[in-house]
Amino acid sequence: MREDYRNAVDRIALTDGKKAALYHQIRLTATPHKNPDAKGRMRWGKRKLVWMAAAALSLVLVAAITINSIPVAAAIATPSYPSEEETANAMADDRYLDALRRFSYQTAGKVERGADGNTVYSPYSMSVVLSMLAQCTDGETREEILHAFGLDTLAQLSEGTAGLYRLLYRDTEEYLCRSVQSVWLDSSLSYNQDVLQSLAEDEYAYSYRMPFEDGRAASAVSDWFSENMKNSRNISVPFIPGNKLMFASGFAFRSEWEEIFIKEQTYEGVFSGTSITGNCEYMNKVAAAVPYLQTEKATASLIGLSGGSSLILILPQEGKELDDILSDGALLQDIVSRTLHAEKTSVEFSIPKVSFEETIDISSVFGQMGIVSAFDETKADFSALSSDTGVFAGQIAESAVLDLNENIETAIGEKAYGSSSGSMYSLHLNRPFCFIIVSQNEIPLMIGAVENVMQLEE
């Protein structure tokens, strides 16, 4: 159907830019959508968690020299997503998992936050980007990537990435956990077919070839993400004119609360932020038999999500700074690990409803971790992918959206609260805190920090 739209628009006597705009307008009109609510947000059902309809988008933009013209994008390699049998039998190498955990927590203190002090990103998505870059590079550039990740060989990284992908992959109405990748090449760029096929098999990446002109590349990638991220928000793709090569990696996550929040228990309270102190709405519930940890530096607990994943909430102790925890990757990893295995008890949660979008430059994160030659046009080595010279990584940006709210109505007979005859602890997130979504095998899927809370619009 998409090709029909393209052909119809191409027959009209318009400039390429106007053709692209008309094509997208036709697609928006012709493509069926799920029913949105009055605010344009998607409804996933009463018991669906809208803790995070999260989408993390990573882009690697590589400098260009020349551009040729071809009509539309052509697929080069296409992945086949894991079957139920493949996910059921998937295994991940322990050394790779240990390296990924260390890498993930080390990034937390290196990510720049927005003007409001808040941020959310996917270290897992970052790791897939690194694996893709490693396969496309060689020499010193590849060595820097492997060293930053803590592995010795490309095979360890690519095979580990592939194994974990199959282990984590789920795509059902109740639970979505999927990383999506694509590689976009300008029509003038030479390429190694075997490398692109390896990206399809190991990182499950699509690859396309098209002219990077008249905004077509940015529009094509935006369309691709709209179709593959399963997210109701439009994802804007930055594009620098003159680029030859673009790597795009995103992470889509949707889950359910294991024990639901109900709207009747939501209340208004004060959040004391670093720059804003004011009222906001708090979700509230009591959960029975959940891990609870108290240390000199932080209090932490978790809320179970479907699919075996967990939302870990970490509140620094009074007088302690959030940066003290985030800037110490080993400390953050220790708190998460101890929380996951802490003694279980009853905990009352008060969690502010937050919603924000962030775009961060993760090239600076990689630079702080020792990956520098990929961004230096005199040293970058992308010879594994292309025989062209002068190719280097110009920019890496990651965009993410976060919604944290109950968004659930209590059904008759449905469990809403836990109860206990023993002692009960509380975790009131009324000042800056951080959160981590971890998979069943304790891989950090998303990391975020909340320093200031703005009231959600009703």
Question: What are the residue ranges of the model-derived segments?
Answer:
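Disordered, charged N-terminal biogenesis/targeting segments of membrane/secreted proteins
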Residues: 1-42
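Non-catalytic, conformational "gating/processing" segments within enzyme and secreted inhibitor domains
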Residues: 77, 88, 116, 154-317, ...
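Extended hydrophobic
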Residues: 247, 299-314, 420-457
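N-terminal export and membrane-targeting signals
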Residues: 41-52
